[in-house]
Amino acid sequence: LTKEVFKDKPNKYRYEPYRRKLAIMRYRLKLTRDRIMQPVEDGQLPGMGGYEHEQQFLHDLYLIRDSLYSHDDKQTADSELKDLIRLAETFGFNLVNLDLRQESTRHTEAVAEILEHAMQREYTALSEQERVDMLGKLVASGQCKLPDRQLLSDATCQTLDVFTVMKKMQEEVSPRAFGDYVISMTHAASHIMEVLFLASLCGLAGKRNNEWVGNISISPLFETIEDLEHIEPVLESLLSNATYRSILQSSGNAQEIMLGYSDSSKDGGIYASVWSLYQAQVRVHAIARSRGIRIRLFHGRGGTMARGGGPTHETILAYPPGTVQGETKFTEQGEVLFYKYNNPETAIYELSVGITGLLKASLNLVETPPEVDPQFLHAATSMAR
């Protein structure tokens, strides 16, 4: 790349190695940016030499830092360069992790159509356990291949296109480009396995060279009170599937579960909703402990009280004892984003009260959490009926 960068002035920065290195890095970043934006801007494909992923960029930054350290120039290395390294480590080339969300019936319909054309199997005629078992075997074996798209409906093609774009963006932008794939209205373990199957057809999950690969994080969303009450058998069935457990282990052995506050509140009232959510969190963490996996709860709340809103600090502290383990995740409704994060002062305040609440709620990691009075549990259950 040196000839291309300095083709007009080959001796530029000849005696300034750091500036010369930074000029090459800047050129590589431009090539990377042009490659990513080419489909959007309909421009020409850039030449070779850009960064393939943020780790290559970080490697160059670390190289400069270590060189400065070796020359006893720690002050320079720990100033603006350190800030840039932290930005690159935190945000990569993607800035944020984009979460995706789709309703469960779209996946069921897509899977049924694909299996009908590819394997002449009537998916909808199978029982719940048969669906889970068959999908697990197909993901593990890679036996099912995508049929000709001309045979598929527009809805199924649109569903598959999401996974195709995920695969492409992970390769072209960053492996961290996407966060979680949320399945709304999750009623059964097969709804999670359907997403895993569709992801495997597009190269996001399965087996490669006899090793499990899971480049998608699936987050089932339990929204109604009935679904919250059945969360235990759904997770037990899911985590009993050997294929799903293997892929989960290959991607960090962490499972995210999203809990819906708005729909459960409309379904049974605010109090019944809150208590069902409380019990669901306790049951989910009990399953996680018994299965040896890590659980992160994603709280779909915010805004008005009916939608699970409330002060951030107190809300986190109200989670069941022992269920917050150093991390939490919750939504912020559009109507409150402006008031909370419109200027740096209020944004810093909101993040501060959230972090302090998280630290307090995570004390169970270093000390035994207090036990909840059984009389309280009995009274709360009676009131929620």
Q: Which residues make up each language-model segment?
A:
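Extended active-site and interfacial segments that coordinate phosphate-rich ligands
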Residues: 113-115, 199, 236-237
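Structural motif corresponding to the C-terminal cap of alpha-helices
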Residues: 72, 167-177, 199-206, 239-243
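Extended, charge-enriched "interface" segments that sit outside catalytic cores
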Residues: 1-172
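Catalytic or ion-translocation cores adjacent to nucleophile or general acid/base/metal-coordination motifs
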Residues: 202-383
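Conserved structured core elements
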Residues: 51, 55-58, 62, 75-82, ...
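Glycine- and acidic
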Residues: 43-50, 63-70, 143-154, 173-185, ...
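A structural signal for short, well-ordered beta-strand segments and their strand-loop junctions
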Residues: 90, 182, 297-299
